[in-house]
């Protein structure tokens, strides 16, 4: 009978268990038949079952829910898979195709409970948007967080990418045909969460935080501020998180594309305006520098599982911005506009943040150093093909002797032409390797120098005829040729006469004996 009573007690609700057990017929029978000892044992058993039922009920309410989802959308190469793999702590991975599935382990340290959060990554090609039906349906919509990923290394694509993928989500949600009442509740919940955001301050409790398991009805009806004119104008009914990846490229944009602080403030202001329209949060991350990766995970579990976080908004660091949903407004965005110098807040995003011109990089051909022996063999073959050349200048082998050089020595001249003394043997000889033109000039120069430097008509000199009329006419007192009587004028006349003689009578030389004229004159 006692066993039957305990089974019945297990099936009843915990609040009514003690009254049913003690006041019912079974309780009266036990109290009257078995005495006080049996009644005391059954009372202890009742208290045990009450504790067990109470603990089970508490655990069922505080247990981490299953079936939560995160949907990532963005362009190809934006870093969607890299971001989730970094959160998981996996360094090496392979990128999926179409619709990729991953998961995040969620652990509640306070309750020692854990679960898995489903992660769906849609391909950057719009061709695959039909696969959203497997990750986002009417049942899982209210348990889903949408993450829009933007590549900050290409900021000129940021705004178009956000608008494109947000419209894809809106189009898919409209196709789900959610009942209007349910959709209205989801939208109101998102508005309520946005309005009730409280920024963590210094007075934030430092004790270990527990998940917020209170229902909406348990919350007090506190007065909230109305939404701004541009806030939640595109309410999807589900939380949205905008993640800007590759923020380490900001320094590259400054160096290579001349971006300044006002450009980054301009980009941030437009992204924050977009986030206001969808009630989204904004986080700047960098997988390369491991910046704000943990913050993304904390924000996900806070939105889906109610985990608290104590991280305030960050807007000072341009590469580590964090703006939770509900913190931002138009006035705070206007603070960025105060730093504009050459830009204006009303400028179009596409006119200011433009795609830089594509630079054609000319890749120089890499020069590979070949083996020394191979190089020497090639060099030897090239040298073998070339004809041998003389070490000096080519020798002029023609039998032509430079014109104007006298060949016949000791010739008699007329009385009015002075005799020419031969060039001494010690004079400079002409190099036979010199060209013909250079040789002729050298011979003439030596010839004229000898005429000007030597005294012509010396006593007993060759080439003077004793019986010439000029000798008789000159008188016998001096015994000198007439050319020596006027030393200042006569040699000049002799030079002209000699030149006339040279031009009238060319000299020929045997080809076998290319002897220089100076040597012939000296012989």
From Swiss-Prot:
Modified residues (Phosphoserine): 207, 398, 405, 412, 419, 421, 427, 487, 510, 516
Alphabetic keyword roster: ATP-binding, Cell cycle, Cell division, Centromere, Chromosome, Cytoplasm, Cytoskeleton, Dynein, Endosome, Host-virus interaction, Kinetochore, Membrane, Microtubule, Mitosis, Motor protein, Nucleotide-binding, Phosphoprotein, Transport
SUPFAM superfamilies the UniProt entry points to: P-loop containing nucleoside triphosphate hydrolases
Binding residues annotated for ATP, in chain numbering: 74-81
Reported modifications of this chain: Phosphorylated during mitosis but not in interphase.
Record's compositionally biased regions (Basic and acidic residues): 493-503
Low complexity bias spans: 9-19, 412-421, 506-523
InterPro entries: Dynein1_light_intermed_chain, Dynein_light_int_chain, P-loop_NTPase
Gene Ontology biological process terms from the UniProt entry: cell division; early endosome to recycling endosome transport; microtubule cytoskeleton organization; microtubule-based movement; positive regulation of mitotic cell cycle spindle assembly checkpoint; regulation of vesicle-mediated transport
Chain intervals for the UniProt region annotation (Disordered): 1-25, 387-434, 456-523
Record's GO cellular component terms: centrosome; cytoplasmic dynein complex; cytosol; endocytic vesicle membrane; ficolin-1-rich granule membrane; kinetochore; membrane; microtubule
UniProt GO MF annotations: ATP binding; dynein heavy chain binding; GDP binding; molecular adaptor activity; protein-macromolecule adaptor activity; RNA binding
Family: Belongs to the dynein light intermediate chain family.
Role summary: Acts as one of several non-catalytic accessory components of the cytoplasmic dynein 1 complex that are thought to be involved in linking dynein to cargos and to adapter proteins that regulate dynein function. Cytoplasmic dynein 1 acts as a motor for the intracellular retrograde motility of vesicles and organelles along microtubules. May play a role in binding dynein to membranous organelles or chromosomes. Probably involved in the microtubule-dependent transport of pericentrin. Is required for progress through the spindle assembly checkpoint.
Subunit: Homodimer. The cytoplasmic dynein 1 complex consists of two catalytic heavy chains (HCs) and a number of non-catalytic subunits presented by intermediate chains (ICs), light intermediate chains (LICs) and light chains (LCs); the composition seems to vary in respect to the IC, LIC and LC composition. The heavy chain homodimer serves as a scaffold for the probable homodimeric assembly of the respective non-catalytic subunits. The ICs and LICs bind directly to the HC dimer and the LCs assemble on the IC dimer. Self-associates. (Microbial infection) Interacts with human adenovirus 5 hexon protein; this interaction probably allows virus intracellular transport.
UniProt protein name: Cytoplasmic dynein 1 light intermediate chain 1
Gene name as annotated: DYNC1LI1
């Amino acid at each position: 009978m006692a066993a039957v009573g305990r089974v019945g007690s297990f099936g009843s609700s915990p609040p009514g268990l003690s009254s049913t057990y003690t006041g019912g017929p079974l309780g009266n029978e036990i109290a009257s038949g078995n005495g006080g000892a049996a009644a005391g044992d059954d009372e202890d058993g009742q208290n045990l079952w009450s504790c067990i039922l109470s603990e089970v009920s508490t655990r069922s309410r505080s247990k981490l829910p299953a079936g939560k989802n995160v949907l990532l959308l963005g362009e190809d190469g934006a870093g969607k898979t890299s971001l989730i793999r970094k959160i998981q702590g996996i360094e090496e991975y392979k990128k999926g195709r179409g619709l990729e599935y991953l998961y995040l382990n969620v652990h509640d340290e306070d309750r020692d409970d854990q679960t898995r959060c489903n992660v769906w990554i849609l391909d950057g090609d719009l061709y695959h948007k039909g696969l959203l039906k497997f990750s986002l349906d009417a049942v899982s919509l209210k348990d889903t967080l949408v993450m829009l990923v933007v590549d900050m290394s290409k900021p000129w694509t940021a705004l178009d990418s956000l608008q494109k993928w947000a419209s894809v989500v809106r189009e898919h949600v409209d196709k789900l045909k959610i009942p209007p009442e349910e959709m209205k509740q989801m939208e109101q919940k998102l508005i309520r969460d946005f309005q009730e955001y409280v920024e963590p301050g210094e007075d934030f409790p430092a004790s270990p935080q527990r998940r917020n398991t209170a229902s909406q009805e348990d919350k007090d009806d506190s007065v909230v501020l109305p939404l701004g004119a541009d806030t939640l104008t595109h309410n999807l009914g589900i939380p949205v998180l905008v993640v800007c990846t590759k923020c380490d490229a900001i320094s590259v944009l400054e160096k290579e594309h001349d971006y300044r602080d006002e450009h980054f403030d301009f980009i941030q202001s437009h992204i924050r305006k977009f986030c206001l329209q969808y009630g989204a949060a904004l986080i700047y991350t960098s997988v390369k520098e491991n910046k704000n990766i943990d913050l993304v995970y904390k924000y996900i579990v806070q939105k889906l599982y109610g985990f608290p976080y104590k991280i305030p908004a960050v807007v000072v660091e341009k590469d580590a911005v964090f703006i939770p949903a509900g913190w931002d407004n138009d006035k705070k965005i206007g603070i960025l506009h105060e730093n504009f110098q050459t830009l204006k807040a009303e400028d179009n995003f596409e006119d200011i943040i433009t795609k830089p011109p594509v630079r054609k990089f000319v890749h120089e051909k890499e020069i590979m150093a070949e083996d020394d022996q191979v190089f020497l063999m090639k060099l030897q073959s090239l040298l073998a093909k070339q004809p041998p050349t003389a070490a000096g200048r080519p020798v002029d082998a023609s039998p032509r002797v430079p014109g104007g050089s006298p060949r016949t020595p000791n010739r008699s001249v007329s009385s009015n032409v002075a005799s020419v003394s031969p060039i001494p043997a010690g004079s400079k000889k002409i190099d036979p390797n010199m060209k013909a033109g250079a040789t002729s000039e050298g011979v003439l120069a030596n010839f004229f120098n000898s005429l000007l430097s030597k005294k012509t008509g010396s006593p007993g000199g060759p080439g003077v005829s004793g019986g010439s009329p000029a000798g008789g006419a000159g008188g016998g007192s001096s015994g000198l040729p007439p050319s020596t009587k006027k030393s200042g004028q006569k040699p000049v006349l002799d030079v002209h006469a000699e030149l006339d003689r040279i031009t009238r009578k060319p000299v020929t030389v045997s080809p076998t004996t290319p002897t220089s004229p100076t040597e012939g004159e000296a012989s």
